[in-house]
Curated annotation (Swiss-Prot):
Disulfide bonds join C21-C66, C52-C80, C85-C129, C114-C141, C146-C192, C178-C205, C210-C251, C237-C262, C267-C309, C294-C320, C325-C372, C355-C383, C387-C429, C414-C440, C446-C492, C475-C503, C507-C551, C534-C562, C567-C609, C595-C621, C629-C672, C658-C683, C690-C732, C718-C743, C752-C791, C780-C802, C811-C853, C839-C864, C870-C923, C909-C934, C939-C981, C967-C992, C997-C1040, C1026-C1051, C1056-C1098, C1084-C1109, C1116-C1159, C1145-C1170, C1174-C1225, C1208-C1235. PROSITE patterns: SUSHI. GO terms for cellular component: extracellular space. This is Complement factor H. The keyword Disulfide bond applies. Sushi 1-3 domain represents the minimal unit capable of cofactor activity. The property to discriminate self surfaces from non-self surfaces depends on the C-terminal region made of Sushis 19-20.
Length: 1236
């Protein structure tokens, strides 16, 4: 409890004792005590003064006094406040904000930021308020800049820059544009952004292309993956849709223009007066159908009650019309009564009718009813012809009379040798009676006696033949028809036999004995010549190797036979022995020689009999010592194989080899014969090279570089686990590789069976199997030497055999082939050796080029035949023979008219044509090889036609092909709208020029019937009407034809003056001038009656005949009939004066004149006329390849001035102008358009 006691004591001491103050206390952080205060205490009343820290200020002094041991503030309200700063200052293109503090006073900090597109210069972006004001300078904002922009390749730039390589400031814009045929890949313009970089990368100018357009409810025709600029694509819309603007679109830099769209076809509900339809919808889509029904008394204008919604509206137009039946004209019949007052008749109304003699109604009654139906009168043909069959001239007549209706047929039987007309056996009842008539006429026949076949005969036994009968004729043995057959056919026709049969002399292909012929014919005509050639070693009877036979009347002129040639014993040296000795020797026989009395033989030790005799030359026997030879000669392009010596003995042989790429012709061995060397071979360059190295399964070839020339070799190797069978190297020999080896899997190699000739190995040798590559030696009985054999994939090489080997037969020295290069040698050759033969210049080798030593004699002996030149080369269309020789040389060659064997000529084609194959022909043994052809270059896509559409279906067109094009609406051509592919280029198309017409012409006395338009399409017509008192003289229309107005309406003044004066008559409402067809009425005065028409009519400026007023009591009889018309009232026998009767025409006939006639003075006034209707028949339309556009009846009746619309049948196009397909019926005649 010591601590509490100390506190109490301290308090008491403070109250009672202390009055001084300690050191003045610190007041605030903003104030600093002035002076030095080092004492421990300070007396009562001492004052301490404070001043403000830097950055602060106050009004007056801040003083504290020591009172009662405490420091007390004398002015408590006085404090140090932060020193203020002025406005920090604005910077252009920037702003600032207080980052520290709430006002501009000591310690405040403002931070500047630049506006977008501007950046601050320097690193200091702030100012602080300190004791001396604002620190730092006001920051500066400068505009942001972007690097210069370079023009894109195939493009250019547009900007407001003064210089092309200057920097751009913030906000500046650069626009890009590509050259023609290119489009931008990237933005069209870029701007310098606030970050100092461009808003996007510089675009590229890429070649304009478009992908196949994707068309909603449509598709492109013949689409491709991509299209180039200005390429055009045609497209078609799906069913129920139509083109938005046009049926094609063009690839542009903006894409497909115009955009290909397919708009749905819609139709509004149809308006059908006097009819109803279903289904009833507010809107119909394309191909939607409606079915309509007409009210009672009305009928569809055309057959059928369906209409379809199309782009042209409802087709056909649904209409209900009143269709009564007019007075019927019955062909070959009449109505029982006049009934004139009952027409036109109502539907279902019936009338009794009867038919003329030989005609009956379809019911075959004597009379029947004609009924008015919605489709017209029924039956359609009221009267049909009735044919009676009761007699057949020259034929079998029926037992009883038989009746047939028009259209029915009957089969008849004529007597033998007779027939109906045209060899028919049926008659048909027609409107004119029987066809053909019932009369059998004698049938035309052909007789054997009417024909004589030289060297042939008719094979059938029949003597006479009916019309159109075919029969066979045969030729005698040794004769054939013109086409080489033994028989032919002839036909009996109206004028006799079809043709004179011919049997010509022929010879069958002969049997050749030891001869060959090039012809493949199986038969030959009279005087035909057949050349043949004997095989080697044979000759014909004349001792020649070639011959010919001729086909004559008695067959071939000779037998094509060749006989084996023979050689006789030649004249020899008297000391020369020959064996074997025979009288004659056959081709191939060998004669060997030896000398007697120890003489030395000089030359070949053997000769062979050939088709040209013995060869080589026979040897001689010499007494003296034979001479040796000096060094053998050098071989051009070759070398000797032996080591060089100074001297070579008689009969010593030296071998040669040709350098690489050279081929040896002749013997590769020469021999020293009595001091002279035999003939050297020749090394000629082999131009033929070998193709690709053959593939080796499971093997590889060591790298080598083509081309591979004659003599080049390549090496093969097998892969691991495979073993090579055969030589490692293959060699190129005359353009062909030698046989390559095989690589066989090592574990699949076959083993070789042992042989009894092998030494014993503990068990029977022939039961032992040996692996591949095993080498075995064996010894034949009675022989001291050992033989060796190796196992090669299951076969011993050489074959294990102890049979006595046949002595190898040597061939005599090779022959000297006639017309071949000198190859004289005396060296014998072993079996299998070959020698290549080289013919002399201007000679050509025939058959094999090499002779082969086989079985001790030379075989495959060729011939050297003389080269035959050729005459003038063949000419080709659109091509000529090109030649590098001078004009003089070409003229000399042309004058000679002969080209040497082997001559090569090349052809060149005219411009626009190319060679179809090799352009070179070669003269070979008097004949030229087949010449090439010059074919027209094909063309690519047809060219673009401005304001037109080219119809193309493929990407490539052959020479001469033609393509048509259509000009856009409002455009046309002055010539044919087609182009042709000519030598790789299209002919120039006709321009599609505007065919619209403007500036409608004006006429003095005529005005337009409709409002005038800005322009009119070609083919469009404009109608005019004449002013009052004028009448149109001709057509009232003019037509726009290819931008020109054609036609002129001519208005003629057809008014009339005062009507003619009539005695005893007055004129009602008389005027001084009357319009055409205006009437003036007369009235008789007093007791006078009017005779004639009471009215006169102004017609084309002239009044009709006026009436007369005279006294009469005359009455009229029945009104006279008119063609194709009748009166509307019941017919009476007597009519009082002044009685009016009305006339009406039949359906589709038009009434001309006054329909009312008046009885005056016992006579009827002028009768009207019924103008004939137009009948449109199916036959006429078929000939013109047209059809009705809206109707499908076989016959349509149209009134005068009615318009009939036609269209082309499917697959045909218009041949006449478009306006002709809207024809007008004019008084029974209509002009038909044509399609083709």
């Amino acid at each position: 409890m010591r601590f509490p006691a100390k506190i109490v004591w301290l308090v008491l001491w403070t109250v009672c004792v202390a009055e001084d103050c300690k050191e003045p206390p610190p007041r605030k952080e903003t104030e600093i005590l002035s002076g030095s205060w080092t004492e421990q205490t300070y007396q009562e009343g001492t004052q301490a003064t404070y001043k403000c820290r830097p950055g602060y200020r106050t009004l007056g002094s801040i003083v504290m006094m020591c009172r009662g041991g405490k420091w007390v503030s004398l002015h408590p309200s006085r404090i140090c406040r932060k020193k203020p700063c002025a406005h920090p200052g604005d910077t252009p293109f920037g702003s600032f904000h207080l980052a520290e503090g709430t006002q501009f006073e000591y310690g405040a900090k403002v931070v500047y930021t630049c506006d977008e597109g501007y950046q601050m210069v320097g690193e200091m972006n702030f100012r602080e308020c300190d004791t001396n004001g604002w620190t730092n300078d006001i920051p500066i904002c400068e505009v942001v800049k972007c690097l210069p922009v370079t023009e894109p390749e195939n493009g250019k730039i547009f900007s407001d820059a003064l210089e092309p390589d200057q920097e751009y400031t913030y906000g500046q814009v650069v626009q890009f544009e590509c050259n023609s045929g290119y489009m931008l890949d990237g933005p069209k313009q870029i701007h310098c952004s606030a970050g100092g970089v461009w808003s996007a990368e510089t675009p590229k100018c890429v070649e304009i292309f478009c992908k196949t357009p994707v068309i909603l409810n449509g598709q492109a025709v013949l689409p491709k993956a991509t299209y180039k600029a200005n390429e055009r694509v045609q497209y078609r819309c799906a069913a129920g849709f139509e083109y938005g603007q046009r049926g094609d679109t063009i690839c542009t830099k903006s894409g497909w223009t115009p955009a290909p769209t397919c708009i749905e076809i819609t139709c509004d509900p149809p308006r059908i007066p006097n009819g109803v339809y279903r289904p009833e919808l507010s809107k119909y889509r394309g191909q939607d159908k409606i079915t309509y029904e007409c009210k009672k008394g009305f009928f569809p204008e055309i057959r059928g009650t369906d209409a379809t919604c199309t782009r042209d509206g409802w087709v056909p137009v649904p209409r209900c019309a009143w269709k009564p039946c007019s007075y019927p004209v019955i062909k070959h019949g009449r109505l029982y009564y006049s009934y004139r007052g009952y027409f036109p008749a109502r539907v279902n109304q019936q009338f009794v009718y009867s038919c003329d003699h030989h005609f009956v109604p379809p019911s075959q009654r004597s009379w029947d009813h004609l009924t008015c139906t919605a489709e017209g009168w029924s039956p359609e043909e009221p009267c049909l012809r009735q044919c009676i069959f009761n007699y057949l001239e020259n034929g079998h007549t029926p037992y009883r009379e038989e009746k047939y209706l028009q259209g029915e047929t009957v089969r008849v039987r004529c007597y033998e040798g007779y027939s109906l007309q045209n060899d028919q056996n049926t008659m048909t009842c027609t409107e004119s009676g029987w066809s053909p008539p019932p009369r059998c006429i004698r049938v035309k026949t052909c007789s054997k006696s009417n024909i004589r076949i030289e060297n042939g005969f008719l094979s059938e036994s029949t003597f006479t033949y009916p019309l159109n009968k075919q029969t066979e004729y045969k030729c005698k043995p040794g004769y054939v028809t013109a086409d080489g057959k033994t028989s032919g056919l002839i036909t009996c026709l109206k004028n006799g036999w079809s043709a004179q049969p011919v049997c010509i002399k022929s010879c069958d292909r002969p049997v050749f004995e030891k001869a060959r012929v090039k012809s493949d014919g199986t038969w030959f005509r009279l005087n035909d010549r057949l050349d043949y050639e004997c095989v080697d070693g044979y000759e014909n009877r004349d001792g020649r190797t070639t011959g010919s036979i001729v086909c004559g009347q008695d067959g071939w002129s000779d037998k094509a036979a060749c006989y084996e040639r023979e050689c006789s014993i030649p004249e020899m040296d008297p000391y020369l022995n020959a064996y074997p000795r025979k009288e004659t020797y056959k081709v191939g026989d060998v004669l060997k020689f030896s000398c007697s009395q120890g003489r030395i033989m000089v030359g070949a030790d053997s000769v062979q009999c050939y088709h040209f005799g013995w060869s080589p030359k026979l040897p001689t026997c010499k007494v003296k010592k034979v001479k040796s030879c000096a060094l053998p000669p050098e071989l051009p392009n070759g070398k000797r194989k032996e080591i060089h010596k100074e001297e070579y003995a008689h009969n010593e042989v030296v071998e040669y080899a040709c350098n690489p790429r050279f081929l040896m012709k002749g013997s590769h061995k020469i021999q020293c014969v009595d001091g002279e060397w035999t003939a050297l071979p020749v090394c000629i360059e082999e131009e033929r090279t070998c193709g690709n190295i053959p593939d080796l399964d499971h093997g590889d070839v060591k790298p080598s570089v083509p081309p591979y020339h004659h003599g080049d070799s390549v090496e093969f190797s097998c892969r691991e686990a495979f073993t090579m069978i055969g030589p490692r190297f293959i060699t190129c020999i005359s353009g062909e590789w030698t046989q390559p080896p095989q690589c066989i899997a090592t574990d699949e190699l076959r083993k070789c069976k042992g042989s009894t000739l092998f030494p014993p190995e503990g068990r029977q040798a022939h039961k032992i199997e040996y692996d591949h590559n095993t080498n075995k030696s064996y010894q034949c009985r009675g022989k001291s030497e050992h033989k060796h054999s190796i196992c090669i994939n299951g076969e011993w090489d050489p074959k294990v055999d102890c049979n006595e080997e046949a002595k190898i037969q040597l061939c005599p020295p090779p022959p000297q082939v006639p017309n071949a290069c000198d190859m004289t040698t005396t060296v014998n050759y072993q079996d299998g050796e070959k020698i290549s033969i080289l013919c002399k210049e201007n000679y050509l080798i025939q058959d094999a080029e090499e002779i082969v030593c086989k079985d001790g004699r030379w075989q495959s002996i060729p011939r050297c035949i003389e080269k035959i030149g050729c005459s003038q080369p063949p000419q080709i269309d659109h091509g000529t023979i090109s030649s590098s020789s001078s004009a003089e040389e070409r003229r000399e060659i042309h004058e000679q008219r002969l080209y040497a064997h082997g001559t090569k000529l090349s052809y060149t084609c005219e411009e626009g044509f190319e060679i179809s194959e090799n352009n070179v022909i070669i003269c070979h043994m008097g004949k030229w090889s087949s010449p090439p052809q010059c074919v027209g270059l094909p063309c690519g896509l047809p060219p673009y036609v401005q304001n037109g559409v080219v119809s193309h279906k493929k990407d490539r067109y052959q020479y001469g092909e033609e393509v048509t094009y259509d000009c856009d609406e409002g455009f046309g051509t002055d010539g044919p709208a087609s182009i042709r592919c000519l030598g790789g280029e299209w002919s120039r198309p006709q321009d599609c020029i505007s065919t619209n017409c403007v500036n409608l012409p004006t006429f003095e006395d005529a005005v337009l019937t409709d409002r005038e338009k800005d322009f009119y399409r070609s083919g469009e017509q404009v109608a005019f009407k004449c002013l009052s008192y004028y009448q149109l003289d001709g057509s009232n229309t003019i037509q726009c034809i290819k931008s020109k107005w054609i036609g002129r309406p001519a208005c003629r003044d057809v008014s009339c003056g005062n009507p003619p004066q009539v005695e005893n008559a007055i004129i009602h409402n008389q005027k001084s001038k009357y319009q055409s067809e205006e009437r003036a009425r007369y009235e008789c005065i007093g007791n006078y009656d009017l005779f004639g028409e009471m009215e006169v009519v102004c017609l084309n400026g002239t009044w009709t005949e006026p009436p007369q007023c005279k006294d009469s009591q005359g009455k009229c009889g029945p009104p006279p009939p008119i063609d194709n018309g009748d009166i509307t009232s019941l017919l009476q026998s007597v009519y009082p004066p002044g009685m009016i009767v009305e006339y009406r025409c039949q359906a589709y006939y038009e009434l001309r004149g006054n329909k009312n006639v008046v009885c005056r003075n016992g006579e009827w006034s002028q009768l009207p006329k019924c103008l004939e209707a137009c009948v449109i028949s199916e036959e006429t339309m078929r000939k013109h390849h047209i059809q009705l556009r809206w109707k499908h009846d076989k016959k349509i009746y149209s009134k005068t001035e009615d318009t009939i619309e036609f269209m082309c049948q499917h697959g045909y196009r218009q041949l006449t102008p478009k306006h002709t397909f809207r024809a007008t019926c004019r008084e029974g005649k209509v002009v038909y358009p044509r399609c083709g």
